[in-house]
């Protein structure tokens, strides 16, 4: 990413813009690059060669991912991302050094830090778009690539919107009931498309695969995307905070609607007990109690079972798919196995 990151800060930019974008560049470095890998794999499946022409698209997508995570961090009021302080949090701390006693300072500080995060994310979106246009100006599949890319952005935004409103309704408007189908819709829009199906589709489109072939392969990968998110939800509660790069309690504090939560409140007698802790800052003892509730209610076991079923479904569909060359099937199956055993 360093090759592209260094171009994100324009020497002619205002010093305030340079400061903000330097934080974006820092956040845009040292990711897992799973989505870039899937773009490369999709391209190899289609083009059957490695001429590196997929690299700008992969870099653009990783930049889009960072941009949308910056927005996500503002929405969730998150403090840590990828093991680093979030951009808006860095500005909170920077402004705190002003040590002002004005009664309006705290509100203004938070509003300004969050606004900077939104601006930086917006800039990141269009940097990503520019990278695609400038790199593939004369490519015959540019229009199709942009259409797919924009569909991914739109679907991710829709998933994020549901993910924002659902917890609010669940916490404050009791007539609305969070059901598993709502959770699955978020997983499909916000994770499956954005993390698995979208990147692989972009690579295949760039490489020249037909719509029929792309549709058959994305069908095989859709269950994988949902399994990926369920794994994330489990790691978010039971994983190592250092490995996952965020606090274990963040899903609880943010009242996140996960499969663990949905199962517990809709299928067990632990609904009221869980709701005593959800949406609150928890002590270690209280957080361990939430973990225990998910276990004794059967939610943890249910989530694992559902996740493993989806991993197996994706494996079977990949193996049966005649449009994926054997060599790339083996790589895809290895990738699925990695997602199964990952701890971050």
Model-derived segments and their meaning:
Residues 53, 139-148, 211-217, 272-276, ...:
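Acidic/histidine metal-binding catalytic segments
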Residues 4-18, 26-36, 116-127, 131-238:
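All-alpha helical catalytic cores of prenyl diphosphate-utilizing isoprenoid enzymes
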Residues 40-47, 127-135, 198-207, 263-269, ...:
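Well-ordered alpha-helical scaffold segments within catalytic/enzyme domains
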Residues 54-82, 150-158, 193-196, 201-204, ...:
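Active-site alpha-helical segments that house and flank conserved acidic catalytic motifs
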